[in-house]
Amino acid sequence: MLTPLTGRSVIVTGASKGIGKGIALRFGAVGAKVLVVSRKIEDAEAVAGEIVAAGGTARGVAADVSSADDMTAMAEAAVAAHGGIDILCANAGIFPTVPLAEMSVGDYDKVMDTNVKGTFLAVTACLPAMKAKRNGRIVLTSSITGPITGVPFMTHYAASKAAQLGFMRAAALELAPWRITVNAVLPGNIATEGLAGLGPEHVKQMEASVPLRRLGSVFDIANAALFLASDEASYITAQSIVVDGGQILPEGGMMAPELDPAA
């Protein structure tokens, strides 16, 4: 049974597709009032419409997480529409691939602006409303790439995701007096629109690298975010939950053999 969050005001950034959409839909399903945030208003409103059609409460807003003005307006919209801010799921992120030797300062800055500065701006914009309530939940979507593993051609992305965890720990300590917790979810390979675009053979290879022999669902990540935002996680802060089907476990690529279907 999913933890009910009836009436809680939640903001989800990067919520028009993939993991962010899964998080928004899951929070809507448990009674939260969801502010769906995307760069394009039509995309945000489409996801909000799905939540409303399923009996939930949601509103879509357009905002760029790398813009301080947009993040301030986002927080104000949540307060105006839903009476405050209880939960922030800072999910927005980009993950382009560029060989390190060919990476420009612009390539690097674009990733850092969205993934690191965007996290900072989203969190700080929501703090006044959370501090006023002396309570809050902040959940970051990080990655196993950077904090735990490395991937070729994604040096800037790996650096940004590792930076998020440093931010998480320091922020958790600083915000604890207001009973605001700060945690992170670290996804492994998740079945999203972007991953499907790599082609079936590449997807098969990725599935084979996971001990549970499947890619994760966006709802696997959403369920972890939901737990960290719940009352049951009120004594958990500065922690990261790896949701990867055991992807980081195999030593030297060694995994248990497949089961015989006939056994």
Over which residues does each language-model region extend?
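Short C-terminal tail/terminal secondary-structure segment
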Residues: 237-263
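Short, small/polar-rich loop/turn modules that mediate ligand/substrate recognition or access, typified
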Residues: 176, 181, 236-238
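Short, well-ordered secondary-structure patches that form non-catalytic structural/interaction elements
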Residues: 103-109, 113, 200-203
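Alpha-helical segment proximal to the catalytic Tyr-Lys
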Residues: 128, 173-174, 234
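Substrate-binding pocket helix/loop in short-chain dehydrogenase/reductase
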Residues: 99-100, 107-109, 195, 206
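Conserved glycine-rich cofactor-binding loop
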Residues: 9, 16-18
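Active-site helix of classical SDR
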Residues: 123, 160, 168
